[in-house]
Amino acid sequence: LPEQIDWRKKGAVTPVKNQGSCGSCWAFSTVSTVESINQIRTGNLISLSEQELVDCDKKNHGCLGGAFVFAYQYIINNGGIDTQANYPYKAVQGPCQAASKVVSIDGYNGVPFCNEXALKQAVAVQPSTVAIDASSAQFQQYSSGIFSGPCGTKLNHGVTIVGYQANYWIVRNSWGRYWGEKGYIRMLRVGGCGLCGIARLPYYPTKA
């Protein structure tokens, strides 16, 4: 495995987005991984529509939260997802619009529970969605450096791991580019279930 990887430097990650006051982190983290695997497979980096998931993925709950697996399943069952340009983000749930199927995926896989080595293996291949406990003031007010807590393991926020170094994960948040390190946070790698539960619920999409 590479000692370090940063998918941003490989051109596989879109600019940081902002979910606003809508609890749609699940859509942002899912879409982020789909954008990345599509770029890795096709060479085209296309910003995709979180709003389509918020409006149309009825197994999830729009601005009231959702699960990665249902979001991936929606994209698979729907035959693809539209672009951000065609179906822009509104930060409120609305009626499902007719949408183009611009980027598709074949499936999704989970990473073994609380296995940081397996998570590193996954991220070496592509960015992965993870759920974390983002409820601490220290997390919310993070501005720079390697974050080491405090935080619990009550999973309440979906984010994307886009790379790693020997001692930290490079994590893409959806709170805009003025949060953290231009929208990112470096989270200490601690083994096991990970800091803030980061290794408890990782998934990634598959695309041939």
From Swiss-Prot:
Disulfide bonds join 22-63, 56-96, 114-193, 151-196. Optimum temperature is 50 degrees Celsius with azoalbumin as substrate. Thermostable up to 70 degrees Celsius. The keyword Disulfide bond applies. E64 binds at residue 25. Keywords: Disulfide bond, Hydrolase, Protease, Secreted, Thiol protease. Activated by thio-specific activators such as cysteine, beta-mercaptoethanol, DTT and glutathione. Inhibited by the thiol-specific inhibitors leupeptin, iodoacetamide, PCMB, NEM, mercuric chloride and sodium tetrathionate. Repressed by the active-site-directed cysteine protease inhibitor E64 (L-trans-epoxysuccinyl-leucylamide-(4-guanido)-butane) produced by Aspergillus japonicus. Optimum pH is 7.5-8.0 with azoalbumin or hemoglobin as substrate. Active and stable from pH 2.0 to 12.0. GO terms for biological process: proteolysis. The keyword Hydrolase applies. Signal peptide: none annotated. Belongs to the peptidase C1 family. This is Ervatamin-C.
